[in-house]
Amino acid sequence: MTIDRYAVIGNPISHSRSPAIHAEFARQTGQQLSYEALLAPLDGFRDAVERFRRAGGRGMNVTVPFKLEAFALTDRCAPRASAAGAVNTLAFGPDGIFGDNTDGAGLIRDIVHNLDRPLERQRVLLLGAGGAARGVLLPLLAARPASLTLANRSVDKAHALAAAFRSHAPDVALDACSFVDLAGRVFDVVINATAASLANEAPQLPPGLYAANALAYDMMYGCGDTPFLAAARSDGATQRADGLGMLVEQAAESFLLWRGVRPDTAAVLAALRRQLDGG
């Protein structure tokens, strides 16, 4: 029996939880496949993808720092990937390489489905204006919040990002500002798409951002609160979540694209959480 091959590619890659996630998805759905982690040289992404494809690979997940290169490698892209200008999922077929970006869909599904927080008519704040923010912006707009504010330490980047996406959702109030300019404003959902948690820091935000029953969401994850979530707790955010659910849900979106079946994520997410917490 031929086993379909998949992989996640990045640099670094040894920390990736994707092989374990997809192995469980395959077991759960009865799919015959293998999934491995591939380390690509920083200057050798294209060659590594082509080698895997020529060897019979069916698809790949792409992580840092190669999502922009993956976008350039595709023959066709999903609209959400085109809008993001970045790809985290490749599917190889007879008509070439198809690219998708499942990050935003994973974020929305985690918030709306797992956390039971509808985004429609909510005041949403997205922190950051880099690749992580850009990758989730179109699905966030499609969720039809009342307003979506992009805040960044460099306000010019936030304004440029808002201008690039404003036409995608003319009925959503989309604005941009600096962190300092957030003073006096209140939000129902605050999403951290900055890399501050990687440096064990939190974005420097003015106090009083969180409405009653607000959600603070960090796209990073770890054991216990990230620095952003700890700061949000102190500032009154009553619901807090890290990005582990987003990781699992974006993987499920990739699996659905490749295999045509959506796996159940609840058990996988619970198992990963136990591992993170040392259980």
Swiss-Prot record:
Pfam families: SDH_C, Shikimate_DH, Shikimate_dh_N. NADP(+) binds at G128, A129, G130, G131, A132, M219, G243. Keywords: Amino-acid biosynthesis, Aromatic amino acid biosynthesis, NADP, Oxidoreductase. The active site is at K67. Its EC number is 1.1.1.25. It is an enzyme of class 1 (oxidoreductase). Signal peptide: none annotated. It catalyses: shikimate + NADP(+) = 3-dehydroshikimate + NADPH + H(+). Pathway: Metabolic intermediate biosynthesis; chorismate biosynthesis; chorismate from D-erythrose 4-phosphate and phosphoenolpyruvate: step 4/7. Shikimate binds at S16, R17, S18, T63, N88, D103, Y221. InterPro entries: Aminoacid_DH-like_N_sf, NAD(P)-bd_dom_sf, SDH_C, Shikimate_DH, Shikimate_DH-bd_N, Shikimate_DH_fam, Shikm_DH/Glu-tRNA_Rdtase. The keyword Chaperone does not apply. GO terms for molecular function: NADP binding; shikimate 3-dehydrogenase (NADP+) activity. GO terms for cellular component: cytosol. Belongs to the shikimate dehydrogenase family. PANTHER family: BIFUNCTIONAL 3-DEHYDROQUINATE DEHYDRATASE_SHIKIMATE DEHYDROGENASE, CHLOROPLASTIC (PTHR21089:SF1), SHIKIMATE DEHYDROGENASE (PTHR21089). NCBIfam families: aroE, PRK00258.1-2. Involved in the biosynthesis of the chorismate, which leads to the biosynthesis of aromatic amino acids. Catalyzes the reversible NADPH linked reduction of 3-dehydroshikimate (DHSA) to yield shikimate (SA). Homodimer. This is Shikimate dehydrogenase (NADP(+)). The lineage of its organism: Bacteria, Pseudomonadati, Pseudomonadota, Betaproteobacteria, Rhodocyclales. The gene is aroE.
